[in-house]
């Protein structure tokens, strides 16, 4: 498991990285994570999140544009545990999570806006692997995202931690 330090990556690659507006908090069991972006665009329906975490996620980060909704959670303990089991590096969720006491013990990175106890509807609605924009940054499938307790950054290509 690679450890990333976003300030060091920003210093080493100032012309390459974009920094998200500071609105995310770390809810996962991994303080730092990074990988290739897979995107979902949805609103108060985590059906596509459930589908993706059931797939192999080695080297990948699921970026979920939940429209910034603070009315329900797009990720809970069961989906986080599936993501960890299937090798996902982490999830960046522009929305809420729940079961936070379990998430912090799960071996997957999770950055989200807040916690909320209500689950989503399951209507099968959402778009996979489309460009999504939130927190002042556009996430494109196949690009790279890195996160730690300092923040979240995006790069068009993979980054190596400086020595």
From Swiss-Prot:
Catalytic activity field: 4-hydroxy-4-methyl-2-oxoglutarate = 2 pyruvate; oxaloacetate + H(+) = pyruvate + CO2
Pfam families: RraA-like (PF03737)
Cofactor binding: number and manner: Divalent metal cation.
Domain of life: Bacteria
Chain positions recorded as a divalent metal cation binding sites: 99
Cofactor dependency: a divalent metal cation
The protein's enzyme class: lyase
Keywords, comma-separated and alphabetical: Lyase, Metal-binding
CDD domains: RraA_family (cd16841)
Positions with a binding annotation for substrate: 76-79, 98
MF-aspect GO terms: 4-hydroxy-4-methyl-2-oxoglutarate aldolase activity; metal ion binding; oxaloacetate decarboxylase activity; ribonuclease inhibitor activity
EC annotation from Swiss-Prot or TrEMBL: 4.1.3.17, 4.1.1.112
Biological processes, Gene Ontology terms: regulation of RNA metabolic process
Function statement: Catalyzes the aldol cleavage of 4-hydroxy-4-methyl-2-oxoglutarate (HMG) into 2 molecules of pyruvate. Also contains a secondary oxaloacetate (OAA) decarboxylase activity due to the common pyruvate enolate transition state formed following C-C bond cleavage in the retro-aldol and decarboxylation reactions.
Family per record: Belongs to the class II aldolase/RraA-like family.
PANTHER family: 4-HYDROXY-4-METHYL-2-OXOGLUTARATE ALDOLASE 3-RELATED (PTHR33254), REGULATOR OF RIBONUCLEASE ACTIVITY A (PTHR33254:SF29)
Subunit structure, interactors included: Homotrimer.
The name this protein goes by in its record: Putative 4-hydroxy-4-methyl-2-oxoglutarate aldolase
Organism expressing this protein natively: Pseudomonas putida (strain W619)
């Amino acid at each position: 498991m690679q450890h990333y330090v976003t300030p060091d990556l920003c210093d080493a690659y100032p012309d390459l990285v974009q920094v998200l507006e500071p609105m995310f908090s770390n809810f996962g069991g991994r303080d730092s994570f990074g990988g290739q972006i897979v995107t979902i665009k949805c609103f108060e329906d985590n059906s596509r999140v459930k589908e993706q975490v059931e797939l192999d996620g080695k080297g990948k980060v699921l970026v979920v544009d939940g429209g910034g909704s603070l009315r329900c959670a797009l990720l809970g303990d069961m989906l986080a545990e599936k993501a960890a089991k299937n090798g996902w590096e982490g999830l960046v969720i522009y929305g809420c999570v729940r079961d936070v006491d379990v998430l912090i013990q799960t071996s997957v990175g999770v950055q989200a806006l807040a916690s909320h106890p209500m689950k989503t509807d399951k209507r099968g609605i959402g778009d996979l692997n489309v460009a999504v924009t939130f927190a002042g940054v556009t996430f494109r499938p196949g690009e790279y995202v890195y996160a730690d307790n300092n923040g979240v950054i995006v790069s068009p290509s993979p980054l190596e931690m400086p020595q």
